[in-house]
Swiss-Prot record:
PANTHER family: DIHYDROOROTATE DEHYDROGENASE (FUMARATE), DIHYDROOROTATE DEHYDROGENASE (QUINONE), MITOCHONDRIAL-RELATED. Disulfide bonds: none annotated. Its EC number is 1.3.1.14. Substrate binds at residues 46, 70-74, 124, 190-191. The active site is at residue 127. Keywords: Cytoplasm, Flavoprotein, FMN, NAD, Oxidoreductase, Pyrimidine biosynthesis. This is Dihydroorotate dehydrogenase B (NAD(+)), catalytic subunit. Binds 1 FMN per subunit. FMN binds at residues 46-47, 124, 163, 189, 216, 242-243, 264-265. Pathway: Pyrimidine metabolism; UMP biosynthesis via de novo pathway; orotate from (S)-dihydroorotate (NAD(+) route): step 1/1. It comes from Methanothermobacter thermautotrophicus (strain ATCC 29096 / DSM 1053 / JCM 10044 / NBRC 100330 / Delta H) (Methanobacterium thermoautotrophicum). The keyword NAD applies.
C-alpha cells in the first residue's frame, strides 16, 4: 500500500511520511496501535517525565478561529507507568517516545528508561505552557538545549530528535545547538504562543491555566517557514508539524525541507482517518506531478 510513499528517518523505515504528533491519542498502547493500523507511518507518544505530573485542571483546551489553544500541563503518569504501556505497543509500529524534564539529568534518565521500547526519542524542550524550568524555557536557550541534547545522547543509543519552539528570535541558532550537541533529527514546531481566550460572559480566561499553546491550521505558515529556514542550515532530517490537515499541507512541508510530517490537531476534526486521507491525496499528487518517491520532494522549494 502506497509504496511510493515509503521513506526513512535516521534509518527508521516508514511506510509513509505521516506520523502521529505527541500529545494526541498518545498515552495508551491501544490508541497508538489504532493510529498505526489506521494508516500512520509512525507514532509519537504523549510527553512523559520521570515522576507523575497531574497537569492542569479542566478546562485544558478551547477551540478558537483557526485551531485550538491547549494547556494540559504535560500531565502524565510517570516513566514507570508509561513503560508498562510501551510494552504493549505492537512490535511493527515505529515508535517515537517523547520525554521532558527540568534538567539534562532528568531528560537523560527518562530517555534511558524507555530506550528499549523506542525506535527514537523525541525531546520536548518546547512546550509553551510547561511548569517553570521545563519546555520552552529550555528550548529558547541555545546553551540549555545543547546540554539537554548532550546528556540524552550520552545516555541512549537510539536516535534522538529535538522538538523546537517557534517562540524564539532565531530558531536556526537553536537548531544549530541541537545538531552540534548530537541530535540526529529535528521536529519543527511545537505549539505557538502562549495564547489566550476570554469568556466575554464571565470576563475570565476560559482555560484553567489562563493561557496555552496554539495549534492547528493557523500556525502552519509559521511552521513551514521554520522548516524552510532550518533546512538550509542543518545536515540532519526534519519532521514538520503544525497545522497539517490534508495532502496539500504535507506537500508544503516536504517542499520546505521536511522528510515527514506529524499530525495532531487534525485528528480532533477528521478523526484517525486523516492519515489515510493524507496518504491517498499525496500519492495522487505525486503521480500527477511525476514524482516517484517522497525523497524527490524534500527541499524542492530551495532549488
Amino acid at each position: 500500500m502506497f509504496f511510493m510513499l515509503e521513506t526513512s528517518i535516521c534509518n527508521i523505515e516508514l511506510r509513509n511520511p505521516t506520523i502521529l504528533a505527541a500529545g494526541v491519542m498518545g498515552s495508551m498502547a491501544s490508541s497508538l496501535n489504532r493510529i498505526y493500523r489506521g494508516g500512520a507511518g509512525a507514532v509519537v507518544t504523549k510527553s512523559f517525565s520521570l515522576r507523575p505530573n497531574p497537569g492542569y485542571r479542566n478546562p485544558t483546551t478551547v477551540e478558537v478561529t483557526g485551531g485550538v489553544i491547549n494547556a494540559i500541563g504535560l500531565s502524565n503518569p510517570g516513566v514507570e507507568a508509561f513503560r508498562e504501556e510501551l510494552k504493549l505497543v505492537d512490535e511493527e509500529v515505529p515508535l517515537i517516545a517523547s520525554v521532558y524534564g527540568a534538567s539534562p539529568e532528568e531528560f537523560a534518565s527518562a530517555a534511558a528508561s524507555v530506550e528499549e521500547y523506542a525506535d527514537m526519542i523525541e525531546l520536548n524542550v518546547s512546550c509553551p505552557h510547561a511548569m517553570a524550568g521545563c519546555g520552552a524555557s529550555i528550548g529558547q536557550d541555545p546553551e540549555l538545549t545543547f546540554r539537554v541534547v548532550s546528556a540524552v545522547k550520552d545516555a541512549v543509543d537510539v536516535p534522538i530528535s529535538t522538538k523546537l519552539t517557534p517562540n524564539v528570535t532565531d530558531i536556526v541558532e537553536i537548531a544549530g545547538s541541537a545538531e552540534e550537541a548530537g541530535s540526529d533529527a529535528l521536529t519543527l514546531i511545537n505549539s505557538l504562543g502562549p495564547g489566550m481566550k476570554i469568556d466575554i460572559k464571565t470576563a475570565r480566561p476560559i482555560l484553567s491555566n489562563a493561557f496555552g499553546g496554539m495549534s492547528g491550521p493557523a500556525i502552519k505558515p509559521v511552521a513551514v517557514r521554520c522548516v524552510y529556514d532550518v533546512y538550509r542550515s542543518v545536515d540532519i532530517p526534519i519532521m514538520g508539524v503544525g497545522g497539517v490537515r490534508d495532502f496539500q499541507d504535507a506537500v508544503e512541508f516536504l517542499f520546505a525541507g521536511a522528510r515527514a510530517v506529524q499530525v495532531g490537531t487534525a485528528i480532533m476534526y477528521d478523526g484517525p482517518e486523516v492519515f489515510m486521507k493524507i496518504c491517498r491525496g499525496l500519492e495522487a499528487f505525486m503521480m500527477a506531478e511525476g514524482f516517484s518517491s517522497v525523497d524527490e520532494m524534500v527541499g524542492l522549494a530551495h532549488d
